[in-house]
Structure formats: structure tokens, C-alpha cells
Amino acid sequence: MNRIPRRLRQLSLIALASLALSACKGADSDLSKESVVRTPEHQSELDKYIEEQFSRPYNIEVLYRYREYEIGRGWVTSPARAENSLQFVNVLRYLFLEPYVETTSKAFVRQFSPQALILTGYSGYNPPPSNTYTLASTINGIKIVFMDINHLDFPTLKALYAEREALQGKTDATSVARYNELDAQIKKTNQSYITTLRTSYLRTIYHESAHTFHQRVEPTTDFDKITSLDYKGGTWTTWWTRNGKRSIQYGFISNYASQEPHEDFAELFAHYIILTPEEWAAKMQEADVIPSGASSSGKVLIERKLAIIKEYMTRQWGLDMDLLRSNVQKRYPEFARQDFTIIH
């Protein structure tokens, strides 16, 4: 068997290394400035905006470039687009950060906000046997993965708002008809935007912020006792449907709230903050039923738990939930006026 001289072997390895480096250099030249893998020193305008407006003041890291190690392989998803990610962070500021600061302070928000928000482009597909889609997932209230960001799009209606305001007070038939037309269009679109947000994103961020409170100081155990016999643990996803019962009539604002007391706490906090008084009243009407074998209606049980949460928030953290709720919801009618596509 012929042996390759040691010196020749060394030269061959050097040559291969040179070829590999050359190949890498060629691959790098094909990468665009929007490629997923980027060095920290090459920040886009969006990166700088996130760092200056979110990371530094609020201690919230927003990661919109695809990082598999942050997401895991449990879902099939895709990268978030920069333009949709910009809308997401602006919406977050408008309906979460600014209302909290208005109610408390920036220091408070830094302490009680999730530390990292991971954005992905599409709903996370859960392969068989599940065959379901995930819109958001959390890790200990510290990191939240928000999915389907590429469908998050809220074109501004500021021109329609301005036109409506210009017609205000005019009494001729043409102006009145146009005003009413604009008013209906704005309200319908605005409500559509808010509904889309609250379905997952807004409820999730308030839900997770609620966890940060009880993780530091537990509220009274009286909360846990109110519906202690009806928590379902891991069966919450199927138990209510399978048994033909409604969780709200047993004192839970959502099926998820019936998993265990901490989720009940967070779900009740989030729903109360984001639902309007009219929507909340409608929920309580649904809950105002005493199930067979029970001694109290779901409405009574929910209101008892809510009273405990409010008292705990005021006493322990100085947070007025009704003021926070008001500061969030007074922004709803003006939501579609905002332009979430620009770097402020």
C-alpha cells in the first residue's frame, strides 16, 4: 500500500482549508442585508428602533429573525417579516406598554414585563396526531413566542378620521350622509382590528404579565379555594366539551382558566383588562347560571375571584386594575387612526 508523505498530506489539508474558506466567502457574498444570520454590528433601522424604544427603556428583547434554538422543533413555522414585526412592536407599545406606564411607571413595567418576545411568520403547525396550529406559546412568563406575525396588518385609517372630523357639525344632507358612512366604516374596521388583536396577542401579553405578579408574591389561598373542586388539570382542553358543560357557569372565564389556580388568576386578569364593560357584562350574563348540584352561579364565583385579584394588586403592587383597564380601552376607538408601519 502506497503511503502519502506527511509533508504532502499537510499541504493537501491546507489547500482544502483554503478552498473551504473560498467557498464560504462566495456564499457570504450571496447573502442580502435581510438575511436571517447577521452580525450584531450590522443593525438595521428596525434593530436600532427596537433597542432604543423597547429593550433599553423596558428591558424587553424582541427577536424577529428566525432562530430555531429559541423556538424549538416542535412546530413547523417560518420567519417573521420585518414590516409586520414593526407593526407588532408599535401595537405592543400602544396597547400594553404606554397604558401600563400611564397607570404606574416605566420602572414598574421593566419589573413586570416578559423579558423576551420571539416573533415567527406563520402559525406554528403541530404535526400529527395533533394537526393543530399554535398562535402563541410561553416559557415561565419570561419568554413569549408570538406566531402568525406575517398576518398581523393594520393599515391606518388616519385619512378617513381626518375627513370625518372635517365634516363634523355640518348639517347639509350630503355632508351628514358622508359623515355617517365614514363613521360606520371606521368603527367597523377598528372593531375588526381590536378583535383580531384580542383573540390571541393582547390577551397573551396581559396574561403573561399577570403571572409575573404571583410568581413573586402569592395572593391569598382564598382564591384557590373558590373553585378548587372544579380545576381540571391537563384535561381542561377536552373535559368541558366531552361532558356537555360550560366552564363559565362553574366560575371560569375561559376553559384554559380551569387548568389550575395560577392560570385562572392570569386568565381572569387578562380578560378583565381587555374586555369592554359591555363585553364583560355579556360574559357575566352567560355565567349567571347555577349548574345542577352547585350552590353558586359562575357569575358569583368569578366576581369573588376578581375581587381578590383587585385587592391583591392594589395592596401588594399598588396597581389599580380599573385604571389600567380604562387606560387600555380609551385607546380602542383611536386604534385605526394610528400608523403602526412607521419608525417613530
Language-model-detected regions and their locations in the chain:
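Auxiliary, metal-adjacent structural segments of Zn-dependent hydrolase domains
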Residues: 29, 86-170, 175
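Active-site recognition of the HExxH zinc-binding catalytic motif
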Residues: 146, 159-171, 177-180, 184-187, ...
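Bacterial N-terminal signal peptides that target proteins for export
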Residues: 2-12
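Acidic, glycine-rich loop-and-strand cores that form catalytic or ligand-binding grooves
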Residues: 202-247
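Second-shell loop/turn segments in exported
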Residues: 74-82, 151-155, 188-196, 200, ...
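Acidic/polar, low-complexity intrinsically disordered N-terminal segments immediately downstream
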Residues: 4, 24-111, 295, 308-344
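Metalloprotease/metallohydrolase-associated module, dominated by Zn2+-dependent proteases
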Residues: 231-344
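C-terminal motif of bacterial Sec signal peptides marking the signal peptidase cleavage site
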Residues: 19-23
